[in-house]
Amino acid sequence: MRALVVYCHPDPASFTAAIRDLVLARLEDAGAETRLHDLYADEFAPGLSRAEWQGYLNSPENRAPVAQAADDLDWCDTLIFVYPTWWYGLPALLKGWLDRVLLPDLAFLMPDRMNRTIRPGLTHITRLGVFTTCGASRWLTLFVGAPGKRTLLRGVRLLCAKRCRTAFAAHYLMDSSTPASRNAHLVRVGRAMDRLTGARPQTRQAPA
């Protein structure tokens, strides 16, 4: 198993960091080779530049500005996102990562004479995990449409293998969370990771 974990949070001491640590621990337990992209620590620039836009369709030259991320996306068979939900969607850095890294001839194939729509390019990815926290309630998030979750588990998922296995866990109402609720969520994340990797259930958890 080759796992790429894309992590996005500005605070190294956040609860989201604890979720990341648990995800990494479960991958280690499953014997996975793992690469971590910490978007804040890496000072990832989310804005698609004019030059990138003008060269967007020029493959493989379009990979040059994000070469490491593109190589890691091409390398992995397991893709996991760990992030906070802000305004019901993805943080700007993570959305920018999708904009700049999910490129033509890498993440998808553009329409051509034989195909009227795009085709999946990430068919080597057979596992997709999404782990997030939300300030809003589950009901309100669903009422708005859960755009962040939909972007990843529907939009990105469509680019992956047809039988791509998925996992999702969200801690809602984070602003009123308690040690008990956070610990319970870590248990859910651990179980979701075990299902995603096919590993036997573990007792290992990251501290809250």
Where are these regions (language model features)?
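Glycine-rich phosphate/pyrophosphate-binding loop and the adjoining helix
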Residues: 140-143, 147-208
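Active-site donor-binding loop signature of nucleotide-sugar glycosyltransferases
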Residues: 39, 133, 171
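Conserved residues at the C-terminal ends of beta-strands
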Residues: 82, 131, 172
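Short, structured loop/turn "capping" segments at alpha-beta junctions
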Residues: 104-109, 162-166
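Short, glycine-/small-residue-rich phosphate/pyrophosphate-handling segment
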Residues: 109-158
